[in-house]
Amino acid sequence: MSKVYLIGDLHGSFKPIRTFDEWNNHNQTFDDVMIVLGDFGGNVLFNYQDSNFKEKLGKYHMTYFIIRGNHEERPSILWAKNPDKWHAEEFFDGPVIVENDYPYIKYAADGMEFYEILGQNVLSIPGAYSVDKFYRIRMNYPWFEHEQLSQAEMAEGEFRILHDQPQVDIILSHTSPMIYRPTDLFLRDIDQSMVDTSMEEFLGHIELSLVPYKLWAWGHYHETRVYPKWSGGQPLMMYNDAVLDLNQFLASDNVYKGLKFFNKE
């Protein structure tokens, strides 16, 4: 059986993957999958840094399944701009977008989408709001207009949850439901009254429709943190200082048996 791992934001750094490779004694193959919970960092600057990062990931003999974050462009937009350089595939029994030069990197759909992973019904939810949006715009740093799900995408996703896929085992998102936002990690120089929390509010709303789930994992906040179970479900915030061995978690229903700390970038 292939192995599946989860990790948080990479932001264009291959070092956490290199450390994982060393920790894992180079035992993974391209049948094994590393799921990145947003802010992957491969489609940000559109120069040699992006391509160098994606090329280096290929050295570690894994397939990467990417949930889009807020600090990167939508793969669907890149595909529309460069139709000869991208294509669609099916992976985990669902639609993905692939850049031709990097076939080992699979991008989950830009809207809410269902997949089957290790026999589990999985919902992917990309995107988030950038709290440093106005600073990025002022400094001419990368900021992506379509970073969040649109209202139409959220409405469509909720409809599918209620009508097409009544049982969801695992939710993989970039940001979290409202109740799990780690306010102790918020940047002090950001006026929180100016922050758009519509996605977090939406995720909090749909969480009530998704219970009982087994696992909800997200990135975004740059810390790994295990939350108490709620209605049998395990909320988990992840950064790139740890991976979750999804096979072990599912076998034990114990997040601590699957969570492996190894590095901090």
Predicted regions and their residues:
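Beta-strand-turn-beta hairpins that frame and shape the catalytic cleft
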Residues: 1-5, 113-124, 167-170, 229-236, ...
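Cap/insert and terminal regions of metallo-dependent hydrolase folds
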Residues: 41, 52-53, 61, 65, ...
